[in-house]
Structures are given as C-alpha cells and as structure tokens.
C-alpha cells in the first residue's frame, strides 16, 4: 500500500515541501533562518490575535486598552511583550536571511529573490503600522513624520497624505485604518511566504559553495527538521530572555507617555530595525531626495541580481568580495547607530558618508571587484 503522505492531495504538498524534499547535504546554519522566519510569523499572528481581542482602535482608549492588557488580562503582559519583542526577533532573522542571500548568491533565483524583497516591504509596512497602535508619544509622532514624507511627491503629495490620514492630521481615522491594515497584512505575508517557498522548490536550495548540488541530495526529514528544531529552540531562548528579563530594552521610553499632538518629543526616531533607513533619509537635506533615498535603500536589493558580474555564484572562494561584504555589514551597523543619534555634528557627516558608502558598495564597488577577481583567475 502506498504511503498516505505521498498520495493524499493535502499531505503530499506538505510531504514534498518538508519531508521528502531533496536538500543539499552541505547547507549550513545560515539556511535555518527561513524556517525561523516562519516561526516568527506564526508567533506574531497568534500573539497579535489575542492582543486584538482586548485592544480598541480609538484615540481616546487605545493607550488605556494596552495598559489594561498588561495589568488586567491573564498573561496579557506576556502576550504584549512577546508580540513587541517578537517583531525585533523577526527583523533580526530577516536581516540575517537577506545577508545570507547576498553572501552566497541566492539572489540568482530571481523570482524567489524578488518575492523576498516584496516580503521585506510588507513586513516593514506591518511593523510601522503596529508601532502606531499603542498611541504613545513615539507612536503618534513617528506616524506623523513618516506619513508626512509622502507630501514630498510632486503634485499629488499633500492630497495623498490627507487621504492616508483620513483628515487633516494623524487622528482617529488614521489609527482605525492602521489597525485594520496591521491585522490583514500578516496573512498576506503568510500567502507571499507560501509563493516564496513555491518558487524556491522549483529550483531547490542554493548551498554555501554556490555549485550545483544535484548529485548530492539528502531528504529534508529527519536531517534538516532536527536542525531547524535546534534553531527554533535557540530563537525561543533569546526571545524569552528578552521578554522575561528586559522587555523594554529595544523599546522607546517615550511610548509610555500617551500621545499628545501639542508636545513634540525631543528626538523622534523609529524602532531600531528602521534606524539604518532613517539615517539614509536624514542624510539628504532635500525632502524629496531623502524619500527617494529611503525607498532606494531597500529597492536596491532588487537590482543586486543584475549586478552579479562574478563567474562564481557564492562569495565562499572570493576573499576580496568577502571583505567588501563585511564592510557593508559594518556600514549598516554604523547607519543604525547614526539613526538613533540627534541631528548635529559629527553625526550628520558620518551618516552622509555611511549612506554614500552603502550605495557605492552595492552598485559600484562590489560588481567591479567581482570583475577583478575573474581577471585574477584568468577567467
């Protein structure tokens, strides 16, 4: 009798994706982050669902409802901090996952990569709208500053901003619609992640060497299921350590003050995972230029596959490209630090130099270095 998991219409989809999937025998722990992102998404959807049962999306009661969740709901504090810090873990995994893709040339799978870029945009939009919901000072002013950037779009800008606000400022209508979008987007993300996997399984996984692994495949289960479980346990360990020991470590103290349109906080800044993009935005003195640079800082990922000039796929055997990759990582960390600093000397000039270096590395220096490496190997 044929095994049910191979014949049942639903089971065979699961089987071909997670059980009998032929996987390269040499993929390292850097390939764990896809499954970790799936776990993060599930955690966020579940905790978010329970938070939504007690949250009210009204400007008068939003802040109080979050306080009520933390004080009066059974384990409400746990659910709330799991959700807030779960977002941070989500972005850590996301950045590492993208970094892996850049290092090992996984971006050569065009459809998978482009859906990944789309997923990054969707997750960033969801996180931004979620940050507005507690209706603290940083929620309100963050929403005001970021939505206001759209007014830089020529001709339609100011109308567009008022349309998004649903009025003449960030108010009840804005909060209500942000809650609605924040609720629906994770399900769209889950669907996109399914398509992401679908395209990945068309080609099979890449591997650290960047060479074809068709001749050397092993079944996903039990080898990589057990490896993924280890990753998940480590993720939960870090997440629970954050939630139970220092839940506010990555948050902003200003968000414990209810939103007040008449009082601007001294330093308006987004959550830590947006700081690199915020630094790039601030480093250009022109409003429209800043908005374009902000969009391009993420969109530049979509161009990466077309700038691949090396004859080798992975950076595993390319020491010069490796150096540049780690310079790019250091540059992004510098931008993240600058994004959290006030707009004054010397932070402004450091931010501008780091922003220029970011675009130069990806668009110019790395492709030229790859050609140089080809030359060294007389290819």
Curated annotation (Swiss-Prot):
Binding-site residues, heme b b566: 97, 196
GO molecular function term, any single one: metal ion binding
Bilayer disposition of the protein: Multi-pass membrane protein
Transmembrane annotation, as ranges: 33-53, 77-98, 113-133, 178-198, 226-246, 288-308, 320-340, 347-367
One of the protein's GO biological processes: mitochondrial electron transport, ubiquinol to cytochrome c
Binding residue positions for heme b b562: 83, 182
Swiss-Prot/TrEMBL cofactor(s): heme b
Keywords per UniProt: Electron transport, Heme, Iron, Membrane, Metal-binding, Mitochondrion, Mitochondrion inner membrane, Respiratory chain, Transmembrane, Transmembrane helix, Transport, Ubiquinone
Keyword DNA repair among UniProt keywords: no
InterPro entries cross-referenced by the UniProt entry: Cyt_b/b6_C, Cyt_b/b6_C_sf, Cyt_b/b6_N, Cytb/b6-like_sf, Cytochrome_b, Cytochrome_b_C_euk/bac, Cytochrome_b_N_euk/bac, Di-haem_cyt_TM
Pfam families assigned to the protein according to its UniProt record, in alphabetical order: Cytochrom_B_C, Cytochrome_B
Cellular compartment(s): Mitochondrion inner membrane
Gene Ontology cellular component terms for the protein in this record: mitochondrial inner membrane; respiratory chain complex III
The record's free-text note on cofactor binding: Binds 2 heme b groups non-covalently.
UniProt keyword Iron, yes or no: yes
PROSITE patterns in alphabetical order: CYTB_CTER, CYTB_NTER
Lineage top rank: taxon: Eukaryota
Residues noted as binding a ubiquinone in the record, renumbered to the chain: 201
Subunit structure: The cytochrome bc1 complex contains 11 subunits: 3 respiratory subunits (MT-CYB, CYC1 and UQCRFS1), 2 core proteins (UQCRC1 and UQCRC2) and 6 low-molecular weight proteins (UQCRH/QCR6, UQCRB/QCR7, UQCRQ/QCR8, UQCR10/QCR9, UQCR11/QCR10 and a cleavage product of UQCRFS1). This cytochrome bc1 complex then forms a dimer.
Homology family: Belongs to the cytochrome b family.
Protein purpose: Component of the ubiquinol-cytochrome c reductase complex (complex III or cytochrome b-c1 complex) that is part of the mitochondrial respiratory chain. The b-c1 complex mediates electron transfer from ubiquinol to cytochrome c. Contributes to the generation of a proton gradient across the mitochondrial membrane that is then used for ATP synthesis.
Note: Heme 1 (or BL or b562) is low-potential and absorbs at about 562 nm, and heme 2 (or BH or b566) is high-potential and absorbs at about 566 nm.
Protein known as: Cytochrome b
Protein source organism: Sorex gracillimus
Gene behind the chain: MT-CYB
